[in-house]
Amino acid sequence: LLVGNTQSYYASPEDKSYYFIAGDAGSAIAVEYNQENPSLIQLSLKTMGNGKDFLIVPDGGYRNPVSPSSFEMRDFEDGVRRNNLHLHMNGMEVFSFAISNVPKAFKELITYFNIEKANIDYLLLHQANKFFCEKIRKKMGFDIEKTPYNIQEFGNTSGTSVPLLMVTNMHKQLSERKLNILFTGFGVGLSLGVGYMKIENLIIPELLYY
C-alpha cells in the first residue's frame, strides 16, 4: 500500500493558517493475509459530501480545469492570500467536523466489533493539528501516554501521518510486542476513517529523510 502527498506544493506561502504546518511524506506498507487472524483490521469509513468546499483545491480537476484565472491571487480573511490552485481550508468547519464525528465513529466501531477499550494499547490520530488531536483524545478518554504525536517535527503529512507516526514514535514497540491499536484519518470530503488492528513483530525500516 503506497501513500504519498506533497502538501507544501498546494499551500499558499501567504496562507499563515496552513502553510507552516504542511508536510511532505510518503509511506510503503506490505500487507499479508494471515489465515489464523482473518479479522486483523476492522474499519469504518464515512464521507459527508456537504462539507466538500471546506477543504478543497478548487481548480485543476475535470470540474474546474486550470485556466488563467486559476493563478490569480485573491485576498481572504485574516490577511490570507491564495489562488484557486492552492488548498482552501475553512479551519473552524474542519475542526467542528473532526471533533464531532471522529469520537462518534470510534465509539460506533468499538461497539460494533465488541472491542474492549481497556485492551487498547495506543490511539493513533491523523496529525492534522495538535489542538484538534487533543480535543479528540480527551473526548475519547485516552491518556496522553497512549496517544503519541509527531506533528511538531513533520507537520501535517496528510494520508501518511499515521504510518509516519508508527515509524518515528513506536518503532521499538511495534517490532517487539503484540499491540491493539485504534487509528484514524480525516480530511478532504469531508471524510473520515477509523480502524482497529491487532499487530505484532512488524518489520519496520528506519525513516528516510529527503
Feature names for model-found ranges:
Residues 15-96, 100, 104, 198-210:
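Condensing-enzyme catalytic core mediating Claisen C-C bond formation in acyl metabolism
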Residues 3-9, 46-48, 153-155, 185-190:
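Acidic, glycine-rich active-site loops and adjacent beta-strand->loop/helix elements
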Residues 10-13, 52, 134-135, 192-193:
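Short glycine-/acidic-enriched loop or helix-start segments at secondary-structure transitions
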Residues 114-119:
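Short, surface-exposed connector motifs at secondary-structure boundaries
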Residues 3-4, 49-54, 130:
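Acyl-CoA/ACP chain-elongation machinery
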Residues 1-7, 73-79, 132-142:
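Acidic-glycine-rich active-site phosphate/pyrophosphate-binding loop
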